[in-house]
């Protein structure tokens, strides 16, 4: 009888252990996603605060200072206000398109964060086509803007949506050609492999030095994709009131601003990953683990250092993007399209041909 009870206890313990493993597996699946969403949310709030402080400094005025220490909670207060404001719907508009448009813009950008290697072994999904996934998903966001403009039943909103689609098409092609050049140099479309390919020679192994023209074209194209000044024609206040945002209010209006800053952040992250070595410390011939005299088995410490390096490089480009917005005037629509089709496209195509030729001769 004692043996029988012991066997029963072992079976019960085994089943409890299996259930704990299942629960742990579920937690392990959702924990990185929740951490990523929390980090993205905090980053967006930080970017909004940085933009207000930088713009205040450029315009020689005082920025937000009362809501929290140094005004850091001002963006949170504005978001809370928009959350409780009424969502107005145009009486003759298409309600379904009007409601779905902002969500498509935000969700399509959030998915792109899954292929960003923030640090050593810290990437949500290491896909073999990581950079192309970002390009494919980023081309979906203008569809949401076009749906919003059409569903608003407003001529200014519709023109803003058309401008967003035209601008996206004009600058998506040069950006894709620049990414192809980077992929040829790294022999991979995976973001993790692209970062590893730049880590062999430290600072001088960055793709910035191997692709200077591609970097300039990519930087301009990414700013145009984010619809930031001097490329914010889809929402030009003097011409289109607020573009595709004209009829929106409440949380739906706030989603467009969230999408704008999410897009700016992901573009800066891809500049860091593709051209500035990602999470590498960038000291020639010295890796992070060797520099701190630790082994890669101490993954948490290495990952934290990698995340810090990645974000430091990313916020440098965020600062440049914000400073550009508050110092340069807006282009006309013809100037914007001419820049994309007549200048950036030939330069990026020539850069791709040169990269392909150099790779063929090096075989």
Swiss-Prot record:
Annotated compartments: Plastid, Chloroplast thylakoid membrane
Annotated signal peptide: none
Any single biological process term in GO: aerobic respiration
UniProt keyword list: Chloroplast, Membrane, NAD, NADP, Plastid, Plastoquinone, Quinone, Thylakoid, Translocase, Transmembrane, Transmembrane helix
Principal location listed in the UniProt entry: plastid
GO molecular function terms listed in the Swiss-Prot or TrEMBL record: oxidoreductase activity, acting on NAD(P)H, quinone or similar compound as acceptor; quinone binding
Membership in a protein family: Belongs to the complex I subunit 1 family.
Protein name: NAD(P)H-quinone oxidoreductase subunit 1, chloroplastic
Gene: ndhA
């Amino acid at each position: 009888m004692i043996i029988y009870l012991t066997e029963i206890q072992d079976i019960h313990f085994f089943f409890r252990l299996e259930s704990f493993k299942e629960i742990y597996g579920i937690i392990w699946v959702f924990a990185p996603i929740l951490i990523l969403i929390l980090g993205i949310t905090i980053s967006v709030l930080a970017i909004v605060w940085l933009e207000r402080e930088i713009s205040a400094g450029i315009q020689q005025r005082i920025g937000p200072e009362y809501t929290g220490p140094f005004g850091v909670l001002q963006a949170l207060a504005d978001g809370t206000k928009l959350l409780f404001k009424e969502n107005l719907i145009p009486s003759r508009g298409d309600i379904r398109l009007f409601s779905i448009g902002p969500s498509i813009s935000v969700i399509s950008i959030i998915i792109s964060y899954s292929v960003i290697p923030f640090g050593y072994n810290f990437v949500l999904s290491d896909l073999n086509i990581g950079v192309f996934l970002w390009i494919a998903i980023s081309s979906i966001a203008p569809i949401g803007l076009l749906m919003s403009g059409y569903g608003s039943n407003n001529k200014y909103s519709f023109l803003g949506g058309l401008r967003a689609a035209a601008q996206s098409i004009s600058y998506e092609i040069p950006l894709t050609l620049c990414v192809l050049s980077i992929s040829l140099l790294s022999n991979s479309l995976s973001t993790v492999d692209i970062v590893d390919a730049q880590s062999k020679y430290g600072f001088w192994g960055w793709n910035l030095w191997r692709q200077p023209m591609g970097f300039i074209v990519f930087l301009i194209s990414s700013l145009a994709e984010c619809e930031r000044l001097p490329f914010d024609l889809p929402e030009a206040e003097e011409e289109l009131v607020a573009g595709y945002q004209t009829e929106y209010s409440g949380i739906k209006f706030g989603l467009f601003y969230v999408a704008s800053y999410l897009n700016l952040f992901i573009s800066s992250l891809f500049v860091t990953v593709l051209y500035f070595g990602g999470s590498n410390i960038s000291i020639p011939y010295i890796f992070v683990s060797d520099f701190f005299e630790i082994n890669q088995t101490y993954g948490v410490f290495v990952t934290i250092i990698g995340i810090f390096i990645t974000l430091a490089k990313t916020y440098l480009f965020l600062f440049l993007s914000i400073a550009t917005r508050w110092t340069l005037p807006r282009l006309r629509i013809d100037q914007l399209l001419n820049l994309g089709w007549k200048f950036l496209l030939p330069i990026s195509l020539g850069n791709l041909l040169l990269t392909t030729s150099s790779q063929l001769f090096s075989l």
